[in-house]
């Protein structure tokens, strides 16, 4: 983006909403009463095309008065919030100096919140920073992230797109801390009806483990952020040292993983009944399939480096999903043999054959018959063609 195209001091608010225009009315009222410079704030909202309730409210002009410029985007349902947020970011033209992600049930309580953000931005003249207001429901996570524009330009995403729910905010939070450009702001946000339930939440143990095992991706992103800061050699060295220290602490947390605790969290926070969570959902399935594929890819990279014990961690994570892949089990069998655990490998291999019978005897017969049929067909065609008389 050309520097001359950037609107200095402008804040772009990005929000997805569904089926609760009465909440938006309160959000808009709070925004109108607390914004110091409304001419420098824009609000972009994503509405699902099948959300008849919200669309009716828009058409009736019931949602016109937010005190700032409001931009609506009507689009298809997505498998995660990330897709809606990226759509709004692109549609905004990316010309704001600051971007903030909001929910449709959160109200600003701090007057002049926008000036607080602008003052923070001035402390990062390179435009690379991550900030977060106070969130009483999740004090240890960057729930409503505020991005300097060059942060987004550097990484080319708001969130990575891996997750159907949760984790995105924690993802960028860890990047910000590792890169040393994360700040908390004295801005108070309050949920309208207290902390609500989470849509799309299912299989939390798998997603929690997936998040832990993708730390290397976040480290790479933090390194990109540091590289883009144009630091002196001494500053860069200190920043990379800070990154490794934070990463080491995060790696220690991986060893404390508890699937029982994540099951408790799922039952506590999910919006859906057990029956709803077991129902097939194409969008969710694609997210999970992509995540499983990534875990297998990471395992293969470790195997190429002869790090078989590490590879098993990634393969075991796939077994926590709803998707069972024979390739993942075969790779684990290979890792176990490389580690000298042949009895365990043999047991797993037998279980694999029970689930996916190879039927080798029949396959050999069919291969032979197929070869005979192919060769016979070739001979017959050749014989017939050789017997034709030229015209």
Regions from the language model: what does each represent?
Residues 86-98:
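Active-site nucleotide-sugar/metal-binding loop of Leloir-type enzymes
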Residues 106-144, 150, 181-184:
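Conserved donor NDP-sugar-binding/catalytic core segment of glycosyltransferases
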Residues 166, 170-279, 292-293:
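C-terminal catalytic/acceptor-binding lobe
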């Amino acid at each position: 983006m050309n520097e001359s195209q950037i609107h200095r001091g402008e804040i772009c608010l990005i929000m997805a909403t569904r089926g609760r225009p009465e909440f938006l009315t309160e959000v808009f009222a709070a925004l109108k009463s607390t914004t110091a410079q409304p001419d420098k704030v824009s609000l972009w909202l994503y509405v699902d095309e099948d959300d008849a309730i919200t669309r009716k409210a828009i058409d009736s002009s019931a949602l016109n008065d937010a005190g700032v410029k409001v931009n609506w985007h009507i689009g298809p349902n997505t498998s995660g919030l990330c897709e809606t947020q990226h759509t709004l970011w692109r549609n905004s033209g990316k010309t704001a100096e600051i971007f903030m992600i909001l929910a449709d049930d959160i109200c600003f309580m701090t007057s002049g919140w926008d000036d607080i953000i602008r003052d923070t931005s001035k402390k990062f003249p390179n435009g690379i920073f991550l900030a977060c207001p106070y969130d009483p429901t999740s004090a240890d996570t960057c729930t409503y992230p505020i991005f300097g524009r060059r942060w987004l330009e550097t990484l080319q995403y708001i969130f990575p797109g891996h997750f159907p729910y949760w984790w995105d905010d924690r993802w960028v939070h860890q990047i910000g801390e590792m890169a040393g450009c994360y700040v908390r702001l004295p801005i108070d946000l309050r949920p309208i009806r207290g902390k609500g339930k989470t849509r799309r939440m299912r299989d939390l143990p798998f997603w929690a483990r997936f998040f832990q095992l993708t730390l290397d991706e976040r480290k790479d992103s933090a390194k990109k952020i540091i590289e883009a800061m144009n630091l002196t050699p001494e500053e860069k060295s200190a920043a990379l040292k800070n990154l490794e220290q934070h990463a080491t602490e995060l790696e220690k947390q991986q060893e404390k993983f508890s699937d029982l605790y994540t099951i408790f969290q799922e039952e506590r926070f999910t919006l859906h009944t057990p029956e709803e969570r077991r129902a097939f959902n194409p969008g969710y399935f694609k997210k999970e399939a992509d995540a499983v594929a990534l875990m297998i890819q990471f395992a293969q990279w470790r195997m190429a480096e002869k790090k078989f014990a590490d590879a098993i961690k990634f393969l075991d994570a796939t077994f926590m999903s709803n998707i069972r892949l024979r390739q993942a089990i075969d790779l684990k069998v290979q890792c176990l043999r490389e580690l000298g655990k042949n009895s365990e490998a043999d047991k797993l291999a037998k279980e694999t054959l029970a689930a996916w019978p190879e039927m080798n005897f029949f396959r050999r017969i069919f291969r032979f018959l197929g070869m005979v049929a192919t060769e016979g067909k070739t001979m017959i065609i050749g014989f017939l063609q050789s017997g034709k008389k030229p015209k």
